[in-house]
């Protein structure tokens, strides 16, 4: 006799399904953690020992991807007490996030790519999909192997590199350092079958995206491999970001930045500009500690 309970059948009934296209009201049958059937009406007795969950009036969709999360914590820019803790699995899954990319921020002194790699692997063992970027704000990049190219090529969870530009907390990298870093990430991606992307933390400097354009003029890394994030932190930067997307680049809007360009306003501007939505992503910047640099202090 077949033991159906071993398969762990679960039937989700009556949800409004987006997959991500609108599928209307559907039932979803799951076995061993995998979807095996989607239909308008799946009988609850289709298999014995099936757990039925009534989702009438609820929305069901694939898990969200958050590509900018400080998995081992962030902050520290106003002293040790402003360091934030690492992310618990439940904080991600309760928000519907099932795929995540971890990275470092300003602090790559007391936080390290090696620790981020361990956290990333732990989340994968706990059941979600997790990757990471090597590097941090600083250029040359803090890495695990001593090379951005090697990190991306041979470390399973590393898919690219991060740095900061147009920000007083950056290392003020010149175009040649940026070009070398982006080229290493690109080649590492080719060798490792990875995206090989370079993510640029954008600050509030009037230079805005100019360092990225300078990079494009001085190396042959495709614009599709360069991803500026936090582009909605000020209006001039967002205007430049729209132009960057028109040229074929991808931009990342930070959902935790409410002004001056709120995420909803940002996506409306993208649509009005006729930019393909495939060139825009949203991420949370989760667990980062945010400071307002508005007045002089002993730390200035």
Model segments located where?
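Divalent metal-dependent hydrolysis catalytic cores, especially in the metallo-beta-lactamase
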Residues: 87-140, 155-171, 190-205, 224-227
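Metal-associated gating/positioning segment near the N- to mid-region
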Residues: 45, 50, 55-118
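Active-site core of metal-dependent hydrolases
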Residues: 169, 183-290
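N-terminal metal-binding scaffold of metallo-dependent hydrolase/deaminase domains
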Residues: 1-47
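Short amphipathic alpha-helices and their capping/turn segments at secondary-structure boundaries
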Residues: 50-51, 55-56, 147-152, 264-276
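Divalent metal-coordination and catalytic microenvironments
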Residues: 15, 33, 57, 68, ...
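Conserved small/polar residues in nucleotide/adenosyl-binding loops
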Residues: 293-300
